[in-house]
């Protein structure tokens, strides 16, 4: 049995640390690297380190530990996670976290299934504040798993320093928010308010009447502040300078019956109440994913909404009003 599998070691520093600080002998180390320059750097540490460039070659091997930083392109990092879980007793990888907030793709479901009764901790952090020049559209995670683990999963937010415990990855938040009691209770309230209708009911192809032309994408997740996962415009339906009154026939829009309803909808979309609903699921710049809109309540479009009037209409308790106002950044005047 090999002792250590490393995903990605561009300068050979991980291999050097494993040998000098952890006592691994070079013969017990396998490094996946497909860049000849990186392979050369590793060989300068020791020519007895095994290097592979084909992930499939690992299927016949077994390791005590798998560590590293796999390729991030699309869901390729999950292929590496799955392979690591299949061939290693213990896994500790740094990679994108988007898969933790959703469960739509088969590879995401497979990764979570393999992590069941193995994952020990999930650490979320802003990779843009750690890796210079990076532009990650989502927080990074350090995913740690053991050969077998039956205890609660530790959920660590480096952005705030807070820790939580969940029993299963299905209990993970669905967006860039922390599962404290107040936030969870507000999310539950929004889910109750959107059982029969939501703002997504208005979204789609232009139907021929009045409309609000929100942009297809809005907000930025690239932020250098380690205390934030996104910029202040991330949880918005449109920018301050967006042209929402000019139709783009090939783009989705919000369809309403008349211009008064359109103006009412815009006043509502600007409120922190509506933007909190968007924040429950939004983890990318896309503004029209049905999942993102599914928990944004749809009020009557017969008036101009204000921050106070929408909270009063839905009878939001004062403590929850204060929480929503503090969680959603100021953006519109």
Q: What are the residue ranges of the model-derived segments?
A:
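Signature of N6-adenine DNA methyltransferases within the class I
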Residues: 1-202
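C-terminal substrate-recognition regions of SAM-dependent nucleic acid methyltransferases
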Residues: 129-323, 328
